[in-house]
Each structure stands twice: as C-alpha cells, then as structure tokens.
Amino acid sequence: MTASLSAPAIGILAVGAYAPAAVITNAHYATRLDTSDDWITSRTGIRERRHAAPDESSSVLGIRATQDLAGRFPGALDGVNLVICATSSPDAMFPSTAALIAGGTGLRGAAAFDVSVACSGFLYALSVGYGMIRAGLAKKALIVGSEVMSGAVDQNDRNTAILFGDGAGCVVIGEVPQGYGFQSFVLGADSAGGPHLYLRGAALRLPEGTEMGPHLTQNGREVFKFAVRTLGDSAEQAMRQAGKTTADIDWLVPHQANIRIIEAACERFGLPIERAVTNLDRYGNTSAASIPLALAEAQAQGRFKDGDQLLLAGFGGGLSWGAAALKWWSGPTGKQSS
C-alpha cells in the first residue's frame, strides 16, 4: 500500500518520550546467560536497555511520554480528539491501551484505539491518524508507541532477552503550513514470513503439532535478511512517492533493532551513518516505541532543522514493513518549553 499526499498539509506538531528508570546492561545478561558484553555489542550495537517497574504497564509508559510532550510543548494537546496507540504489549485485550492513555492525559472522550503491527506499528498508526485527519474525522491526533517488551520475552533466552527493552514515545499530528509535513506512506505485510517472528496471543489457534511458547520467538537470521531488504525497499519507494530520491534524505529515523541493519541501509542510500538517528545502544529494541523515542530524542537535541527531509522506516512481525517521508516543520517543535 502506498500513498502520495497533498493538501491539507499534515505533519508533526509535538513530540515526547519516556524511558523507565531501570537500566539493564549487557553485563547483567553476561552473568546469567551464555553471552558477553562484547558478543552482544558486536552483533547488535546494544549496550543497555530499560526495563519497566512492576507498576509500569504500556499505558503508564504512554501516559508519561504524553506528559513529557505536554510539558515540552504547552498547549499541544489542545484540540486532540483522536488517540492511537501502537503496541504489542497492551495492558489488556480491552479496554484499549489508547483509551487508558487518553483517560490519563485529560483526553477523555477522544476516539481511542490500538494498532498491533509489532515493530512496524508506529508507522501504521501514523498513517491511520493522518488519514482520519484528512477525512475530517479528527482535528489533531496523538499517536503513541508504547511497549513493555521485557515481559514478552523469556529472560533466560539469549536470542531475545538481550535485544528488547521498554519505553514509549509519542507525537501530535495536525495541520502544518503547505510544503511541510507528511509526503508519502508505504505499508505492507507478508504472512509467509509470520513464523519467523511471533508472540503468542490469548486466542491463538495453532496447526496440530506446532510448538509455541508463551514468549516472543524469533528466527534472527531470517528476520535480519528480511529487514535489510525491506527497510531499503520501502524507504526508496516512500521517497519516490514523495518525488524525491534517497539522496535527498537529511535524516533517516529507522526502527532501532540492530545497528547492522541501519548501517546496511545507510550504505545502500549513500548516507553517512551520522545522519541516521540511533539510540538502540541505550534502549535496545523497543518495538513500536523505537521510532517515536528516536524522534523525540533527536528533536530535543536540536538535530532537526526547518525544512529537513526525514525518512521514517521500520519492519516487524507479520512480517510487516512501513516507511514515511516528511518535511520537518520546526514551528511548534522549535518552540518547546525549556
């Protein structure tokens, strides 16, 4: 699915993030599993990740990220009448995590629902929010990516425990001046690769003889090959739909899964690695939260300038993929509260 976009211009008005306090270093796993700091860092780029406290669910993390946004950008939540949360670790099947976030941030009464597309979820949620604003069904939308992945993985499994962390990020989207905002979206999925990355659900039906535990399971080799290919393909397609090429990218904001995947994308695009926003060394793979976390951090550091060409790209369970091209508007985002 692709979309090339025109008036009204809709873009990012505010950003926010939250990471739990507990820092889990590679040394933690080196003492428990057959691994080492060097092994993890050299293969993934991850040095540490955050784990949520027992009382920090995905809705709590999402609320705190939204509070961070509201503190940095006073008035940004005014007029928001749609809340979408991308998560694979919801508080419950229902009520939706989005509804709980809305209730905890003064947005009670706003339309609210969750999107579940694993690590691609934030891009899917962005596209849905964009479409609802374009259709006149919403004025402004709060899009949240929030995950407690530490509870979804087996902490004794070296193949997954070392990769994932907890956190939340969010954006408010709405109308921006012409020439700014989202230019294109590319989304897709192929269930043929579904068995390579899955997390058992409460109502899951399995073929006879299939073995699946309660935790996230990943075929790392196959997911890596898929990610390298689709991240590059979807990014090129999104830029093409926007009337651009990858040579026009000022900042790549990718899903934070593995530094090797990001390096491969940069090499393919001829983009210096310094122009890719990365924080997986400190947060690990936070699934649907990774792109908004990276956006919020880069914005706070003043890395994005007015008119910069951004490319957001991700991949995840499904197997799924997504990308979005946008022209950064530093209007509200350049006027955050100190």
UniProtKB/Swiss-Prot annotation:
Q: Which family does it belong to?
A: Belongs to the thiolase-like superfamily. FabH family.
Q: Which residues form a coiled coil?
A: none
- Positions of the UniProt region annotated as ACP-binding: 256-260
* Location of this chain's protein in the cell: Cytoplasm
The reply to whether Acyltransferase figures as a keyword in the UniProt entry is yes
Q: Domains: what does the record tell us? A: The last Arg residue of the ACP-binding site is essential for the weak association between ACP/AcpP and FabH.
The cross-references to Pfam families, in alphabetical order and at most eight, read: ACP_syn_III (PF08545), ACP_syn_III_C (PF08541)
Subunit relationships: Homodimer.
The function of this protein is: Catalyzes the condensation reaction of fatty acid synthesis by the addition to an acyl acceptor of two carbons from malonyl-ACP. Catalyzes the first condensation reaction which initiates fatty acid synthesis and may therefore play a role in governing the total rate of fatty acid production. Possesses both acetoacetyl-ACP synthase and acetyl transacylase activities. Its substrate specificity determines the biosynthesis of branched-chain and/or straight-chain of fatty acids.
Identify this protein by name.
Answer: Beta-ketoacyl-[acyl-carrier-protein] synthase III 2
Tell me which InterPro entries the record gives: ACP_syn_III_C, ACP_syn_III_N, FabH, Thiolase-like
Major enzyme class:
transferase
Classification via NCBIfam families: fabH, PRK09352.1
Known pathway: Lipid metabolism; fatty acid biosynthesis
Catalytic reaction annotation? malonyl-[ACP] + acetyl-CoA + H(+) = 3-oxobutanoyl-[ACP] + CO2 + CoA
Q: Name one GO cellular component term.
A: cytoplasm
Primary localization class, coarse: cytoplasm
Q: Which UniProt keywords apply?
A: Acyltransferase, Cytoplasm, Fatty acid biosynthesis, Fatty acid metabolism, Lipid biosynthesis, Lipid metabolism, Multifunctional enzyme, Transferase
Q: Which residues form the active site?
A: 119, 255, 285
Entry's Gene Ontology BP terms: fatty acid biosynthetic process; secondary metabolite biosynthetic process
List its EC numbers: 2.3.1.180
Q: Its domain of life?
A: Bacteria
GO MF, one term, reads: 3-oxoacyl-[acyl-carrier-protein] synthase activity
